[in-house]
Amino acid sequence: MRLSRYFLPILKENPKEAEIVSHRLMLRSGMIRQQSAGIYSWLPIGLKVLNKVCTIIREEQNRAGANEILMPTIQSADLWRESGRYGAYGKEMLRIQDRQEREMLFGPTNEEMVTDIFRSYVRSYKDLPLNLYHIQWKFRDEVRPRFGVMRSREFLMKDAYSFDLDYEGAKMAYYRMFVSYLRTFARVGLQAIPMRADTGPIGGDLSHEFIILAETGESQVYCDRAYLDLAVPGADTDFRNDAQLTDIVTRWTTPYAATDEMHDEADWAKVKPESQVSARGIEVGHIFHFGTKYSEPMGAKVQGPDGKEHLVSMGSYGIGPSRLVAAAIEASHDDAGIIWPKAIAPFGAGIVNMKPGDEGCDGVSEKLYEALTNAGVDPLLDDKDERPGAKFATMDLIGLPTQVIVGPRGVAAGEVEVKDRKMGERQSLGIEAAINMLTAQA
């Protein structure tokens, strides 16, 4: 993409309404625009990042055996009456009446609808286990939306729902999603720590929040430093191997980790002082087993191997892709702007033509652009006629992992300068050497 043809509305000043780093940088870099309180449009560069996050989530959900569907945003109130939640849900639910005076709602979550889909088609235990997921926009009318897309009223959510014959099957479905989430966050470039969460009236221990450590996090968290050294499950993980999954979950739940709500001082005291990490954290995912909470009132049953009907045991598993984008910025930025992990960077590299109109600079810039494009690097070529300082500031702000600087002096010497955004290191390379280095990383 050529910057001269790209819609990138950069803001020179920090927006006054932005309270945290991610909100400020997303507005400044032209990723999002606020349309009303807690509601945002995603602009081209922001949407590219969001789509990359969703692609990784999809790949890992599919790898774990989940099936993607797409449920509507507008739901019937009748389904929620079946589960008993319509009257219990507060003002955060946006309630709607259509022209036939039927009561509808803008879905804040999808347990009722997915249970209705399941009970309409599945009759036998032989069709289990089953995991259905979708990625869809949701709406919750927060009393005080703040922090940009970190706590917005409209947000994108990946929610998965598992259906099993019994608790043992549901536990393994939970373990599959647990491991899938570890891989998902690692691929996005984040180190997420699973922390035991409240299970409410269901009880048991199958509820975890996935937290990344960040100074601007909303939650106070406590964990054993051992988490920082744990190896994330590899691409060769066999999601059909229950023993392997159980071993991974055991390793990732043995060290101490808790949010402020679940913190236990007695258990915390057992952690060696040098291993104690007390920090702020951001929740980026939540997985939860809720048994027959929805299958019982909605009659979601299957015939078991004993010939009798059994209520299915269910779980839900959520990741907010839009929130995850903001969390990635909170975890990786500096005073100049965003520092994107390579996997979700909007472009693979930025080419900075320091002197558009100069035959040498134009020629080398075009050569680099064509070579990187053909290699699948997806470069952004800054071909705009602006002063060098503004060009560098833009590239640093939008956070592309690598910048290739093409200037008259370098071109005369047959070289370009390559800058690593994260490390800040610069090196001069021959043009072909630079192409080879960047295409090898594609």
From Swiss-Prot:
HAMAP family: Pro_tRNA_synth_type2. Homodimer. It catalyses: tRNA(Pro) + L-proline + ATP = L-prolyl-tRNA(Pro) + AMP + diphosphate. The keyword tRNA processing does not apply. It is an enzyme of class 6 (ligase). Catalyzes the attachment of proline to tRNA(Pro) in a two-step reaction: proline is first activated by ATP to form Pro-AMP and then transferred to the acceptor end of tRNA(Pro). It is found in: Cytoplasm. Its EC number is 6.1.1.15. One of its GO terms (cellular component) is cytosol. Keywords: Aminoacyl-tRNA synthetase, ATP-binding, Cytoplasm, Ligase, Nucleotide-binding, Protein biosynthesis. It comes from the Bacteria. Belongs to the class-II aminoacyl-tRNA synthetase family. ProS type 2 subfamily. It comes from Brucella suis biovar 1 (strain 1330). Gene3D superfamilies: Anticodon-binding domain, Bira Bifunctional Protein, Domain 2. One of its GO terms (molecular function) is ATP binding. It holds the Pfam family HGTP_anticodon. InterPro entries: aa-tRNA-synt_IIb, aa-tRNA-synth_II, aa-tRNA-synth_II/BPL/LPL, Anticodon-bd, Anticodon-bd_dom_sf, Pro-tRNA-ligase_IIa, Pro-tRNA-synth_IIa_bac-type, Pro-tRNA_synthetase. The lineage of its organism: Bacteria, Pseudomonadati, Pseudomonadota, Alphaproteobacteria, Hyphomicrobiales. Signal peptide: none annotated. This is Proline--tRNA ligase. GO terms for biological process: prolyl-tRNA aminoacylation.
